[in-house]
Amino acid sequence: EIAVMFTEEGVNGAHQDPQYNVLYRNINMIRSFVDAAESKKIMAFGEMAQIDGAHNANATARDAWKVMPELLVQHAINSRMSERIGIRPDLICLSTVPPAAPPSPDLKLNLPYALALREFFDKYKMRAQMNTKYMDSSTREATVTHVLNLLISRLTSADIQSTITPDEGRNVPWHVYNIEALD
């Protein structure tokens, strides 16, 4: 129903990544992939951009950098499924949200990930490299993280900037940190 509503309303992009439901939410695998296939078909008809949300693993994992290979595999599965269903490659936007945040060494871990993602998936669009922050993080830490994320986006390029919803309200919406990073 959401895909139909978004298409009717002219929404230009939406998340659609069934593997997240299976891997992190323990939702029935068959239901997740059948629902996703139906949604993707409608999104293809409406020429809506698919924003791949494999980055959600980063928000969920305790040691997020350990899921880096898993993120690449998730992107591969979801992108290929989308293409097989009919979404054009230029409408598939991979989330480049980095697999690490402080106190890990940001550029040392995140720049190679950003480069690998672009090397492996060069026919898709790249969504800006921004990490979400938890409610208890300091304003300075969030701003510094976003400055470093912005630097990586500028060094590696990003095609779109999209908003993300807080994961169960645990993350502070990050628009203000983007603005402070640009300042």
Locations of regions flagged by a protein language model:
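Anaerobic metallocofactor- and corrinoid-dependent redox/one-carbon enzyme cores
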Residues: 1-183
